[in-house]
């Protein structure tokens, strides 16, 4: 009886531990999580140096978020194998971009991970369009025409320990084309269209239609050819096919 009670207590303790850990993982439908992801992306997109003339305001896409969640749940510290296949990842986009962050759940916030990607700006030379170190996360983050995003978090103890989390963001249309700048250098918003408004140095279209609600949208892209890697995050790089 004592042994049975002991196992019952251990089972309850284990259940509590799982529940405690799971409660820290935000849902892809959590408005607070969504706002944090969008705000951090747009804050850094609006602060690029040199300034961007055509940087678009980024908005949330449910389909990209579902894609990010499905891949995060795989707990693989590598890129989704659908990224180099036309319309394979998500029907709304021919190709999708991807950034991945890995770290402890206690230190995780969307802003923390996204800022880590942005900090790669120090390794990017805008004039030569080259990186002195890994900077693919930065260039995807500030790719002017990648203005749909969906992100997700999952616990992945197999990747480092019980508190290890993986954070995945997917972008549409995909960015990171070789020998192309992520945006047009110039006065902020100077290349916004007539339909767009300048919001915090970003070109924002009022009442923008989200791709997964628009079955007629046919965005285009190029086949991805290269993957960037560092110990803490991954950035998906694309090479333009000539």
Curated annotation (Swiss-Prot):
Tissue distribution: Highly expressed in testis.
UniProt cross-references to SMART domains, sorted A to Z: SCP
Keyword match Chloroplast: no
PTM statement from Swiss-Prot or TrEMBL: N-glycosylated. N-glycosylation decreases during the transit in the caput.
Lipidation (GPI-anchor amidated glycine): 221
The protein's name in its UniProt record: GLIPR1-like protein 1
Membrane topology recorded in Swiss-Prot or TrEMBL: Lipid-anchor; GPI-anchor
Higher taxonomy: Eukaryota, Metazoa, Chordata, Craniata, Vertebrata
Record family assignment: Belongs to the CRISP family.
Keywords of this entry: Cell membrane, Cytoplasmic vesicle, Fertilization, Glycoprotein, GPI-anchor, Lipoprotein, Membrane, Secreted, Signal
Pfam families named in the record: CAP
Residue span(s) of the pro-peptide: 222-242
């Amino acid at each position: 009886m004592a042994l049975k009670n002991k196992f019952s207590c251990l089972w309850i303790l284990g259940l509590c531990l799982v529940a405690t850990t799971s409660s820290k993982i935000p849902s892809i439908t959590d408005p607070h999580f969504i706002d944090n992801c969008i705000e951090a992306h747009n804050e850094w997109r609006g602060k690029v140096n040199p300034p961007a003339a055509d940087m678009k305001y980024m908005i949330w896409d449910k389909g990209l978020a579902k894609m990010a969640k499905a891949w995060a749940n795989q707990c693989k510290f590598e890129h989704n194998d659908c990224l180099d296949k036309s319309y394979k990842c998500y029907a709304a986009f021919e190709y999708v971009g991807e950034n991945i962050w890995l770290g402890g759940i206690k230190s995780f916030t969307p802003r923390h991970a996204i800022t880590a990607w942005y900090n790669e700006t120090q390794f990017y030379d805008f004039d030569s369009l080259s990186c002195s170190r890994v900077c693919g996360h930065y260039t995807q983050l500030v790719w002017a025409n990648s203005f749909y995003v969906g992100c997700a978090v999952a616990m992945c103890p197999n990747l480092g320990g019980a508190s290890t989390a993986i954070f995945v963001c997917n972008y549409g249309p995909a960015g990171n084309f070789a020998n192309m700048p992520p945006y047009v250098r110039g006065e902020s918003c100077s290349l916004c269209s007539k339909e767009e408004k300048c919001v915090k140095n970003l070109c924002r279209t009022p009442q923008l239609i989200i791709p997964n609600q628009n079955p007629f949208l046919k965005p285009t892209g190029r086949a991805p050819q290269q993957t960037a890697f560092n110990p803490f995050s991954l950035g998906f790089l694309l090479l333009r096919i000539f």
